[in-house]
């Protein structure tokens, strides 16, 4: 359950408590989604033993996702310290996301290509920021501390510390998120 505290700490901007978890769950639609995602993964073994347990949870989760405008696949693998900066228009498929990732609104992260032709989903590194309106698709890797700018369309690997601008996604520098997370 410490992973939930690491998420709420990102929302709060300092060390989070269970009181903060309650506060953000009640007041922040985007935190509500990541909180329920975490609960599902913590309680999966319990939910799967209860007849219709997973079904009831899944219905509630989908309801909360619709309310917030965030479609987050329960099959995604997300590291600790995750934060939706804003909510609305966010689609995250079955992808891998590292620690301390920030995602802004209207972002799409997911599968591209055809199954038979080697399509796939992205892997996002640690300390990555993905700006508003960005699209990151395909079997690609976004390196640690990369910054994907607003409205960028990314379909190829991005090295660590790269800053990617809008269409087409071009590397603008190699300073990434340096200073963004206080390091």
Describe the residue ranges of each PLM region.
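Short, basic/aromatic-enriched C-terminal tail that caps enzymatic domains
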Residues: 167-183
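Left-handed beta-helix
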Residues: 68, 74, 79-80, 85-86, ...
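Terminal amphipathic alpha-helical/low-complexity segments used for targeting or macromolecular assembly
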Residues: 1-68, 178-183
């Amino acid at each position: 359950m410490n992973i939930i505290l690491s998420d709420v700490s990102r929302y709060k901007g300092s060390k989070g408590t269970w009181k903060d978890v309650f506060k953000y769950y009640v007041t922040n639609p985007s935190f509500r989604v990541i909180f329920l995602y975490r609960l599902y993964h913590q309680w999966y073994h319990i939910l799967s033993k209860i007849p219709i347990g997973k079904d009831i949870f899944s219905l509630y989760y989908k309801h909360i996702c619709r309310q917030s405008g965030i479609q987050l696949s329960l099959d995604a693998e997300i590291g600790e310290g995750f934060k939706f900066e804003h909510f609305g228009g966010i689609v995250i498929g079955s992808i891998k996301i590292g620690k301390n990732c920030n995602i802004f609104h209207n972002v799409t992260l997911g599968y591209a290509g055809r199954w038979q032709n080697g399509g796939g989903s992205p892997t996002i590194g640690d300390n990555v920021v993905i700006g508003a309106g960005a699209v990151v698709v395909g079997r690609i890797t976004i390196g640690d501390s990369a910054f994907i700018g607003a409205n960028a369309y990314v379909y190829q690997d991005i090295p660590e510390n790269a800053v990617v601008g809008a269409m087409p996604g071009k590397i603008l520098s190699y300073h990434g998120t340096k200073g963004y997370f206080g390091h």
